[in-house]
Swiss-Prot record:
<feature type="binding site">
    <location>
        <position position="177"/>
    </location>
    <ligand>
        <name>substrate</name>
    </ligand>
</feature>
<dbReference type="InterPro" id="IPR036422">
    <property type="entry name" value="RuBisCO_lsu_N_sf"/>
</dbReference>
<dbReference type="InterPro" id="IPR017443">
    <property type="entry name" value="RuBisCO_lsu_fd_N"/>
</dbReference>
<feature type="modified residue" description="N-acetylproline">
    <location>
        <position position="3"/>
    </location>
</feature>
<dbReference type="GO" id="GO:0000287">
    <property type="term" value="F:magnesium ion binding"/>
</dbReference>
<dbReference type="InterPro" id="IPR020888">
    <property type="entry name" value="RuBisCO_lsuI"/>
</dbReference>
<dbReference type="Pfam" id="PF02788">
    <property type="entry name" value="RuBisCO_large_N"/>
</dbReference>
<keyword id="KW-0602">Photosynthesis</keyword>
<keyword id="KW-0503">Monooxygenase</keyword>
<feature type="active site" description="Proton acceptor">
    <location>
        <position position="175"/>
    </location>
</feature>
<keyword id="KW-0120">Carbon dioxide fixation</keyword>
<feature type="site" description="Transition state stabilizer">
    <location>
        <position position="334"/>
    </location>
</feature>
<comment type="subunit">
    <text>Heterohexadecamer of 8 large chains and 8 small chains; disulfide-linked. The disulfide link is formed within the large subunit homodimers.</text>
</comment>
<keyword id="KW-0934">Plastid</keyword>
<dbReference type="GO" id="GO:0016984">
    <property type="term" value="F:ribulose-bisphosphate carboxylase activity"/>
</dbReference>
<feature type="active site" description="Proton acceptor">
    <location>
        <position position="294"/>
    </location>
</feature>
<keyword id="KW-0560">Oxidoreductase</keyword>
């Protein structure tokens, strides 16, 4: 080795491993308005200090690796590195912390949820120094939000397209979710729409199977929509699931839906992927289609409290990527969802501005500027007795979706739809008259059932049905 080479090797570089906290833990740092901020729930391995664990998360999700490398000297780490700038102990837990990390905006490709998640929730989640890691929340800066189109249309444009105001929208998932022929499927769609629903829906796993190919389903559902519209004088829709094995096939299905003149298509955004979802959202805006989003696979990611990613993060990502509706739990039905937490991310979906609110699990103030809002969809194990609570919890800007709660009616699909529409109209009228839905809900439904035999029959069938299980994902509270 030449003397010149030896001299260069000894200046500004020292091989070896050093603590992450020496570079990536910066409690004096004041986050910039342009930084993406993340709140991680960190459970270190025994003996790993919280500062080292938080710094490791910042490092491994930005510029760091396990050892010092030559090429660190070829760039400005201070400009590009993530910084763990604050750590809070989690109330009631012995070795768990909320670590706040700031990422410079230059780390991320414009308009790409895929790239953002590849960094922030990538390899770091398998890091051995951590027993568990969960991304609780993100603050998306305005500068980054403006690089996204967002939802194809948003809440107000959808209401104008449908000419429906002053109440939640009503939907129904066609059951059984798999096995029906396209013609029988279309018949069920027609009966539900004729009975008073605004929408019917493909289930998340209805794509293009041997028993019902997608093109046949689209044709029979379009026929059902037009027939129901002619009979009721209302605009109707069916969420035609365009999810496919390739992006090209997905867009082909959306093109066919547009050619049929239907108002809305659907996508499974987690199994389909954010790249596919963003592409479909762009197509929908350009071609006047509404986009319904199903969150199939979300519980694999978000249900465990200590590891994974909270749904509020997935909800924010969807608002960036694009969708006009997204499933958001029910609070009262068969699927996971604590009330305060659910209402927290429902507001993040709908509102332009949401303040930090620990009581609802919101770690950062979020401003969406001109990004349209997304309608939350309440779906899963709900029926007419839940209608007052759903109307009170979710308000007008929501979709209330009754699958079994429509198709399970003893008189058939259309009477099931009638029962739900009557129950909803009764709840909206009672609320507008100043009645307390939370306290008087059951009375309101009973009163309405006197004038609707369809509702009375539904009330009798589902009077004993409850799903009384505690939520797994709950707010942090001190152990008393």
């Amino acid at each position: 080795m030449s003397p010149q080479t030896e001299t260069k090797a000894s200046v500004g570089f020292k091989a070896g491993v050093k603590d992450y906290k020496l570079t990536y833990y910066t409690p004096e740092y004041q986050p910039l308005d342009t930084d993406i901020l993340a709140a991680f729930r960190v459970t270190p391995q025994p003996g790993v200090p919280s500062e080292e664990a938080g710094a490791a998360v910042a490092a491994e999700s930005s510029t760091g690796t396990w050892t010092t490398v030559w090429t660190d000297g070829l760039t400005s780490l201070d400009r590009y590195k993530g910084r763990c700038y604050h750590i809070d102990a989690v109330p009631g837990e012995d070795n768990q912390y909320i670590c706040y990390v700031a990422y410079p905006l230059d780390l991320f490709e414009e308009g790409s949820v895929t790239n953002m998640f590849t960094s922030i929730v990538g390899n770091v989640f398998g890091f051995k120094a951590l027993r568990a890691l969960r991304l609780e929340d993100l603050r998306i800066p305005v500068a980054y939000i403006k690089t996204f189109q967002g939802p194809p249309h948003g809440i107000q444009v959808e209401r104008d397209k449908l000419n429906k105001y002053g109440r939640p929208l009503l939907g129904c998932t066609i059951k059984p979710k798999l096995g029906l022929s396209a013609k029988n499927y279309g018949r069920a769609v027609y009966e539900c729409l004729r009975g008073g629903l605004d929408f019917t829906k493909d289930d998340e796993n209805v794509n293009s199977q041997p028993f019902m190919r997608w093109r046949d389903r689209f044709l029979f559902c379009a026929e059902a929509i037009y027939k129901a519209q002619a009979e009721t004088g209302e605009i109707k829709g069916h969420y035609l699931n365009a999810t496919a094995g390739t992006c090209e096939e997905m867009i082909k299905r959306a093109v066919f839906a547009r050619e049929l003149g239907v108002p809305i298509v659907m996508h499974d955004y987690l199994t389909g992927g954010f790249t596919a979802n963003t592409s479909l959202a762009h197509y929908c805006r350009d071609n006047g289609l509404l986009l319904h989003i199903h969150r199939a696979m979300h519980a694999v990611i978000d249900r465990q409290k200590n590891h994974g990613m909270h749904f509020r993060v997935l909800a924010k990502a969807l608002r960036l990527s694009g969708g006009d509706h997204i499933h958001a739990g029910t609070v009262v039905g068969k699927l996971e969802g604590e009330r305060d937490i659910t209402l927290g991310f429902v507001d993040l979906l709908r509102d332009d501005y949401t303040e930090i609110d620990p009581e609802r699990g919101i770690y950062f103030t979020q401003f969406w500027v001109s990004t349209p809002g997304v309608l939350p969809v309440a779906s899963g194990g709900i029926h007419v007795w839940h209608m007052p609570a759903l109307t009170e919890i979710f308000g007008d800007d929501s979709v209330l979706q009754f699958g079994g709660g429509t198709l399970g009616h003893p008189w058939g699909n259309a009477p099931g739809a009638v029962a739900n529409r009557v129950a909803l109209e009764a709840c909206v009228q009672a609320r507008n008259e100043g009645r307390d839905l939370a306290r008087e809900g059951a009375t309101i439904i009973r009163e309405a059932s006197k004038w609707s035999p369809e509702l009375a029959a539904a009330c009798e069938v589902w009077k004993e049905i409850k799903f009384e299980f505690p939520a797994v994902d709950t707010l942090d509270k001190k152990k008393g």
